Amino acid sequence: MNIETNLKTLIVKNPLKLDCGKTIKDFPIAYETYGSLNSQKDNAILVFHALTGDQYVSGTNPVTKKDGWWSYAVGPGKAIDTNKYFVICSNVIGGCMGSYGPSDLDSENGNIQGTNFPVITINDMVNAQYNLLDHFGIDKLFSVAGGSMGGMQVLQFISNFPDKSKTVIPIATTSSHSAQNIAFNELGRQAIMADSNWKEGDYSSNNSNPGKGLAVARMAAHITYLSKKGLQEKFGRKLQERDDLKFGFDADFQIESYLRYQGSVFVDRFDANSYLYITRAMDYFDLTKQFKGNLSDAFKDTKAKFFIISFTSDWLYPTQENKDIVIALNSIGADVGFVEIETDKGHDSFLLEVPDFLNTLKNFLDKSYEEH
């Protein structure tokens, strides 16, 4: 399901060798921009999206007709002020919103690639997106920013291109995917692949869609984005439009109905194979391993200013995993700031209207811009 909209698309002509050993070329990267690039071309912020995000950071998403996924943070006068900054965000390769992914046709046989699409990594995503800098003639970004998988891309970007951003903002992220998170992703993948409509990844050619499996994958993942306290306060044991239990398997509880809804609407906007590929890329991410066990070496060549943000109730990428990045940066004398935001909204806090987070982000950017 490659959703067609009025896409801004860059066709990357240069061959890109992937970590799996395969090479791709003449491939599309779908992107969106907000604000204006100044004459010095030094006010650009490259935003990286999370697992189920896309290039539509702000404004209205033309597919869902809802606000962009980071509308609380990006826009005129907001934390990432588009009156001041030129914001770029692209759909990652492997995605389903216009960038090169498993729904694209194979250039050799004309068939939808499905699981013949090459396995990609966070490193591959970042190297593909780097082409946007050349496209806009940007020598150095003002900032790179992103949460969750977006934060992984932020870390990979500054490791790969140490002199290409003045500031670096990884949010609610990690330097390597834990066993717990690999387990949750595998649960989602198995739900998709167990759906009889998956057809070994060839469902598009068979006019089918593994929507039930994808919905379950989304439901399971969505739980990890929340917190126990937040769930209890919002739902508790409240019943869904009924006065008593029905002694069946319909959604008796509000939380059941909520998760089913999250699964059903997700199927309308996301592709099952893309979910497989992107979660696999997240699981393969291990910046420490790339540098033979020394995370500090990933950042030793950069003079960028880091600002790392975590949330108290995030159990998907807990504060300690963010602090490990801070420790690695401190060990090489890097310019690094860190803040832990108190909130009960869980991992998804970076996507929500959390005033302390938004004010902290805005203050860091504004101060850095004044110094700049």
PLM segments and residue spans:
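Short beta-strand/loop motif that positions the catalytic acidic residue
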Residues: 302, 308-310
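N-terminal cap/lid subdomain of alpha/beta-hydrolase-fold enzymes
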Residues: 32, 37-106
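Alpha/beta-hydrolase-fold enzymes
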Residues: 170-265
